[in-house]
Swiss-Prot record:
Example of a GO cellular component annotation carried by this entry: nucleus
Top-level taxon of origin: Eukaryota
Annotated region described as Disordered, given as residue ranges: 1-221
Entry keyword set: Repeat
Record's protein name: Late embryogenesis abundant protein, group 3
Annotated Low complexity bias: 43-52
Compositional bias per record (Polar residues), positions renumbered to this chain: 212-221
Family as reported in the entry's similarity comment: Belongs to the LEA type 4 family.
Gene: MGL3
Length: 221
């Protein structure tokens, strides 16, 4: 009976010991697991913190890099804008200078053209005036020549008419004198005065010559 109780006690003690051992092992394992979990959590937290710090630093660096990039781009844009503005000013200056030069050349060409036109007009006017004077002089000379010819023709016509008139008068006078002398001779012959007839003929011839001389003098005048 006692052996049976001792055995039961022994078994109970072993069971308790094993239970305690298992409990201790379980507790130790739990502690180990908890520590391991804690360590892992700490590592994770540290890693996360490191990542966060790294991310923060990376963000800062990125922001800095972005700021530097933007600043660089801004400076480049400003520089480019400055170059563009300077080039625009230079181009505008060249364009203005070219426009002024072109305007000056155009004005000078216009003045020269106007001067040439004025000179041509003066020359043409002078030529026209000279031609008009020459034409007037030629017309006046022609008029004088025609007037002289007309005067000469009138003079010649008058002299010719005078000569003709003088010839007709002289012829008529001679015919009248001849007829008168004939009648006188007939009368003298009838009266028997032939000697006187010769004297009368002499007188008649003298009168005839005198008349001819008078006619000649009149015709010459």
């Amino acid at each position: 009976m006692a052996s049976h109780q001792d055995k039961a006690s022994y078994q109970a003690g072993e069971t308790k010991a094993r239970t305690e051992e298992k409990t201790g092992q379980a507790v130790g394992a739990t502690k180990d697991t908890a520590q391991h979990a804690k360590d892992r959590a700490a590592d994770a937290a540290g890693h996360a913190a490191g990542k966060g710090q790294d991310a923060k630093e990376a963000t800062k660096q990125k922001a800095s890099d972005t700021g530097s990039y933007l600043g660089k781009k801004t400076d480049e844009a400003k520089h480019k804008a400055g170059e563009t503005t300077e080039a625009t000013k230079h181009k505008a200056g060249e364009t203005t200078e070219a426009a002024k030069q072109k305007a000056g050349e155009t004005t000078e060409a216009a003045k020269q053209k106007a001067g040439e036109t004025t000179e041509t007009t003066k020359q043409k006017a002078g030529e026209t005036t000279e031609a008009a004077r020459q034409k007037a002089a030629d017309a006046m000379e022609a008029a004088k020549q025609k007037a002289a010819e007309a005067g000469q023709y009138a003079k010649d016509t008058a002299v010719s008419g005078k000569d003709k008139s003088g010839g007709v008068i002289q012829q008529a006078t001679e015919q009248v004198k001849s007829a008168a002398a004939g009648r006188k001779d007939a009368v003298m012959s009838t009266l028997g005065m032939g000697g006187d007839n010769k004297q009368g003929d002499a007188n008649t011839n003298t009168n005839t010559n005198t008349t001819k001389d008078s006619s000649t003098i009149t015709r010459d005048h």
